[in-house]
């Protein structure tokens, strides 16, 4: 993916950069593969904010992505590469020989016209989806299942990639992009290669309005609030937080305290925790 940088014509274009979308095909999304999406704006079913700093933004049409890749009967041909407003990775339409059409995540290096395969008999090639038991150690993979048949849940963001480190008995050891080493059943499916749009994290929005287009609202510091709104709030003029350690808006310890349950069921599958930032 190529990135275009702006000159400082206005304060908003200073340091701003956008994707040139050179890989994108000039096609509208397939209507039968899309759904109308109602924005929740960070609210739950009672209208209470459960995820702050969300709301507004451009209207979006949701594209139904095939994370299962369970069409084992026929090879598929990449028909288009498209932009998806609901994720930072690109997506592509696959036309299968049996007449089926599906959206999948775009693997890096795949072009329009390339063939992809799924199933136990598929070759070890970029974009093919194969059970972990058939993939050699050292192979780079993405869109990894946690439960066989449930569909890919791990390593789906733009530019991410995992690596198979070892295989023994029923389990494969996978190194995730975070640095975590995790055991995953060898019956789970994974896609060969890296997710496309690898330069997505190098784009600079440049102005506040660009973030509002994405549906992200401003983040206000706790010390700038009133004491009724945040534990850090209140005081005369610029004051410190007035506490021994930083707190969340709900009074829990912030910045460094572990929030993961000590007895979570998946702890036994994690061989090495992710790296500290």
Swiss-Prot record:
<feature type="region of interest" description="Disordered">
    <location>
        <begin position="36"/>
        <end position="56"/>
    </location>
</feature>
<dbReference type="InterPro" id="IPR022666">
    <property type="entry name" value="Ribosomal_uL2_RNA-bd_dom"/>
</dbReference>
<protein>
    <recommendedName>
        <fullName>Large ribosomal subunit protein uL2c</fullName>
    </recommendedName>
</protein>
<dbReference type="Pfam" id="PF03947">
    <property type="entry name" value="Ribosomal_L2_C"/>
</dbReference>
<dbReference type="InterPro" id="IPR014726">
    <property type="entry name" value="Ribosomal_uL2_dom3"/>
</dbReference>
<dbReference type="GO" id="GO:0003735">
    <property type="term" value="F:structural constituent of ribosome"/>
</dbReference>
<keyword id="KW-0150">Chloroplast</keyword>
<comment type="similarity">
    <text>Belongs to the universal ribosomal protein uL2 family.</text>
</comment>
<keyword id="KW-0934">Plastid</keyword>
<keyword id="KW-0687">Ribonucleoprotein</keyword>
<dbReference type="InterPro" id="IPR005880">
    <property type="entry name" value="Ribosomal_uL2_bac/org-type"/>
</dbReference>
<dbReference type="InterPro" id="IPR002171">
    <property type="entry name" value="Ribosomal_uL2"/>
</dbReference>
<dbReference type="GO" id="GO:0009507">
    <property type="term" value="C:chloroplast"/>
</dbReference>
<dbReference type="GO" id="GO:0005762">
    <property type="term" value="C:mitochondrial large ribosomal subunit"/>
</dbReference>
<dbReference type="Pfam" id="PF00181">
    <property type="entry name" value="Ribosomal_L2"/>
</dbReference>
<comment type="subunit">
    <text>Part of the 50S ribosomal subunit.</text>
</comment>
<dbReference type="InterPro" id="IPR008991">
    <property type="entry name" value="Translation_prot_SH3-like_sf"/>
</dbReference>
<dbReference type="InterPro" id="IPR022669">
    <property type="entry name" value="Ribosomal_uL2_C"/>
</dbReference>
<dbReference type="InterPro" id="IPR012340">
    <property type="entry name" value="NA-bd_OB-fold"/>
</dbReference>
<dbReference type="GO" id="GO:0016740">
    <property type="term" value="F:transferase activity"/>
</dbReference>
<dbReference type="GO" id="GO:0032543">
    <property type="term" value="P:mitochondrial translation"/>
</dbReference>
<keyword id="KW-0689">Ribosomal protein</keyword>
<dbReference type="InterPro" id="IPR014722">
    <property type="entry name" value="Rib_uL2_dom2"/>
</dbReference>
<feature type="region of interest" description="Disordered">
    <location>
        <begin position="225"/>
        <end position="259"/>
    </location>
</feature>
<dbReference type="GO" id="GO:0019843">
    <property type="term" value="F:rRNA binding"/>
</dbReference>
